[in-house]
Amino acid sequence: MKNTIATFQEFKNKGKKISMLTAYDYSMAKIIDESGINGILIGDSLGMVIKGEEDTLSVTVDEIIYHTKSVKKGAKNALIVSDMPFLSYHTSVEEAVKNAGKMIKEGGANAVKLEGGASVIKQIKAIVDAQIPVMGHLGLTPQSVNAFGGFKIQGKSEEAAKRLIEDAKLIEDAGAFAIVLECVPKKVAEIITKEISIPTIGIGAGNECDGQILVYQDMLGMFDDFIPKFVKQYANLGAQMREAIQIYIGEVGEGSFPQDKHSFKIDEKELQKLY
């Protein structure tokens, strides 16, 4: 059954946990979707895990749309959420609505996600008014990595925690259907989760959030350039993939692959005509 923003709200109301993962292509989206995930985020994290960049800042709207199209074809039941990249909504309300609309109309997303608190409330309201569901994002917002001075936990002081709580309430009032809380102290995330009526999706924010999200390469052990503290690796596919590829290389080198069962045959009579 197709997950919707109503499904997410129903889960929160009933105390059921929401599960989300990232995806960027058809094949992986299909596997994730068939596993029963509630939501898939086409994250600007693709800048790091797909493009090999050091951060997410270079990702463009067109790149998000391209990957959203691929994910959409593979995921039939998950809620599809597309990240709004750096500077795709910051410059003006009009630009924010235009780019959000492109992700829905051209990419096929069900919703968009954007980072920030009080500074982006006008954008959130305008996008919601355009009938586009919005997921907020507070805490460690990767697009603000330069402003934060690196990838650091947020909300550790009383002042910073109060600001996060207030921002969460503002985002809810603006009409967002959910909020991602990234790298926020567990107790602060718990307070936010209790004080707002929309779902919170945690990533490095403890288990009191209404749901969780991870980058699939992280949780499957496929990306070892950097492993965040909040990641649990449920498999070590990177090592398994390298081993499989090395076996393939060895079999090609010794001529044991392909075998007859991997090859096609020609009728013996037709073959004789070639000599």
From Swiss-Prot:
Quaternary organization: Homodecamer; pentamer of dimers.
GO CC, any one term: cytoplasm
E.C. no: 2.1.2.11
Record's keyword terms, sorted: Cytoplasm, Magnesium, Metal-binding, Pantothenate biosynthesis, Transferase
Domain of life: Bacteria
Protein name per Swiss-Prot or TrEMBL: 3-methyl-2-oxobutanoate hydroxymethyltransferase
Pfam family of the protein (one): Pantoate_transf
Reaction(s) catalysed (UniProt annotation): 3-methyl-2-oxobutanoate + (6R)-5,10-methylene-5,6,7,8-tetrahydrofolate + H2O = 2-dehydropantoate + (6S)-5,6,7,8-tetrahydrofolate
Residue positions binding 3-methyl-2-oxobutanoate: 44-45, 83, 113
Claim: Magnesium is one of the keywords in the record: yes
Gene Ontology MF, one: 3-methyl-2-oxobutanoate hydroxymethyltransferase activity
Cofactor: Mg(2+)
Protein family: Belongs to the PanB family.
Catalytic residues of the enzyme: 182 (proton acceptor)
Residues at which Mg(2+) binds: 44, 83, 115
A GO BP annotation: pantothenate biosynthetic process
Main subcellular localisation: cytoplasm
Pathway in which this enzyme or protein is active: Cofactor biosynthesis; (R)-pantothenate biosynthesis; (R)-pantoate from 3-methyl-2-oxobutanoate: step 1/2
InterPro entries in the record: Pantoate_hydroxy_MeTrfase (IPR003700), Pyrv/PenolPyrv_kinase-like_dom (IPR015813), Pyrv_kinase-like_dom_sf (IPR040442)
CDD domains xref list: KPHMT-like
Subcellular location: Cytoplasm
Source species taxonomy: Bacteria, Bacillati, Bacillota, Clostridia, Eubacteriales
Cofactor note: Binds 1 Mg(2+) ion per subunit.
